[in-house]
Amino acid sequence: MSLIHRRLYRISGLSSVNAWNLQIREAVNRNDPVESLLLFREMKRGGFEPNNFTFPFVAKACARLADVGCCEMVHAHLIKSPFWSDVFVGTATVDMFVKCNSVDYAAKVFERMPERDATTWNAMLSGFCQSGHTDKAFSLFREMRLNEITPDSVTVMTLIQSASFEKSLKLLEAMHAVGIRLGVDVQVTVANTWISTYGKCGDLDSAKLVFEAIDRGDRTVVSWNSMFKAYSVFGEAFDAFGLYCLMLREEFKPDLSTFINLAASCQNPETLTQGRLIHSHAIHLGTDQDIEAINTFISMYSKSEDTCSARLLFDIMTSRTCVSWTVMISGYAEKGDMDEALALFHAMIKSGEKPDLVTLLSLISGCGKFGSLETGKWIDARADIYGCKRDNVMICNALIDMYSKCGSIHEARDIFDNTPEKTVVTWTTMIAGYALNGIFLEALKLFSKMIDLDYKPNHITFLAVLQACAHSGSLEKGWEYFHIMKQVYNISPGLDHYSCMVDLLGRKGKLEEALELIRNMSAKPDAGIWGALLNACKIHRNVKIAEQAAESLFNLEPQMAAPYVEMANIYAAAGMWDGFARIRSIMKQRNIKKYPGESVIQVNGKNHSFTVGEHGHVENEVIYFTLNGLSLFAKDKHVLYKDVYKEQSYELFI
């Protein structure tokens, strides 16, 4: 019997509106929205008028289809019926338009409703939140309170979504306070949402407090997973692993989400051991065969610099998605193995899997990071073929960054000028490109133009501008932008901004001012800041301040060789050989070695790597003959002496 005949047979005995409603509801419940709408049509043709139970079922079917045309058709029938003012029907209609991304239609229906309950308000709030209209959502929430409608847990969780979307800690804290006043904070579903959102908004401590406040008997697997997700945002693998052990001791059974979030926490070489333990447990529990889990583990191994394990997982996959290919390609690109990344990209095309925007962005980013200009040009020329045209702002931003890092600043500017819809990221990337390539005045000029065109700079924009000021020695301009950032744009300086200012002051020889700035910082200075000061001390031969900077670096990064070598060189340049010997002794005691630096250049599409003091290159004789010839052009004997001394000092520590 055909589908049409079966339908005709089924509806032939329907003799009442309730019978039709039952059939429509069953079709919706078995996720067959098309059948629901066909039944609705046949019901109308049969002379049966829908009632206040029919319309909510049909509205749900339209929402499942996400078809605005169907929504408008059902709404047209509704406004002709006597049930348009029914609060239950009206709420279902608002929800229908919201789920079809027609928030404006939903708002019109909402405004015309003579009666609304908390569910109606929640449906409209959800629409504004999902569409990113945070201001409208909170304005509606205020209106809801003025109308004396009591919010419930759904209201709170809906508005938490807005805070999550905006990554606004202030909004989240405000909704947390509302939730406590309403008494919904004791509900575990609300607490779970708070935990994950606090993590996303950058407040791990508050996420921990909410988790710990949940009674042990009330915690669910979702509670633990929410906390793991918060840890993954910060890359706190060790704390996440400790919490996972506690979860097992309390006899909770981990699920797929548990392992995905835990693996997402282990994204660097230091946490590879924890990542492997998590992976082995996932295998033991049989949750490692899910494609999303495999993709996450591939990403984990790749970012932990274990591309061999990542590739093994990738190769044994029975089926792959675009994400599978992309995370593996990205792993090679991040490591600098562009040849392997490109080979895998070709294999992806050959397999019939179409690369997406993220795939191309991964390749372009890798080319910029490791200076693979020719490969970058090849990808740029073929981006259109894979549906990522030059008018895509994300592609434009990535290409500007890539060409800038590869030294092709004119190509970067050409893309910038031809980007149709520039964003703050576009301007920031171009400014950073100029700063990176030593074209500092152009960077500052472009920043001024950005401000004139009413673009609002962010913290990364100011970082690029301060770097330009530092490298150009523009101390006055640097202070000006540093204060503008705080006073005009309300952006709190981060450690990187302070590092730039320390670098700028150091270059100008104002080491006491730089040290004072560090001491007055609200945050604890990191290795980058002390390193900038130490480098400035080396340039200006200030042993006293250098010792303070070096001591801080020794405490922060006791196994990093660079600060020891820098301090030893400062002592040597000052003729303080006792200090020089003391640093050497400390390095031997702590088994710290300075490995020679490596650089890579690309000639005729082929990468060539060199290390400091290397004598094993196939073109060794030609290279050193050329270098010796170039050294004859060094007119300043002091500069030449410093270069020779620096090479000798490196050899002492290798």
Swiss-Prot record:
Span list, region Type E(+) motif: 605-635
GO BP of this protein: RNA modification
Keyword Repeat part of the UniProt annotation: yes
UniProt entry keywords in alphabetical sequence: Mitochondrion, Repeat, Transit peptide
Region annotated Type E motif, chain positions: 529-604
PPR repeat extents: 86-116, 117-151, 152-186, 187-217, 220-254, 255-289, 290-320, 321-355, 356-390, 392-422, 423-457, 458-488, 494-524
Gene3D superfamilies named among the record's database cross-references: Tetratricopeptide repeat domain (1.25.40.10)
Recorded GO MF terms: RNA binding
Pfam families xrefs: E_motif, PPR, PPR_2
Source taxon at top rank: Eukaryota
Chief location bin: mitochondrion
InterPro entries according to UniProt: E_motif, Pentatricopeptide_rpt, PPR_At4g14850-like_plant, TPR-like_helical_dom_sf
Keyword Magnesium on entry: no
GO CC terms: mitochondrion
PROSITE patterns, alphabetized: PPR
Annotated localization: Mitochondrion
Location of the transit peptide in the chain: 1-65
PANTHER family in the record: PENTATRICOPEPTIDE REPEAT-CONTAINING PROTEIN, TETRATRICOPEPTIDE-LIKE HELICAL DOMAIN, DYW DOMAIN PROTEIN-RELATED
Similarity remark: Belongs to the PPR family. PCMP-E subfamily.
Protein name: Pentatricopeptide repeat-containing protein At4g19191, mitochondrial
Native species: Arabidopsis thaliana (Mouse-ear cress)
Gene that this polypeptide is encoded by: PCMP-E1
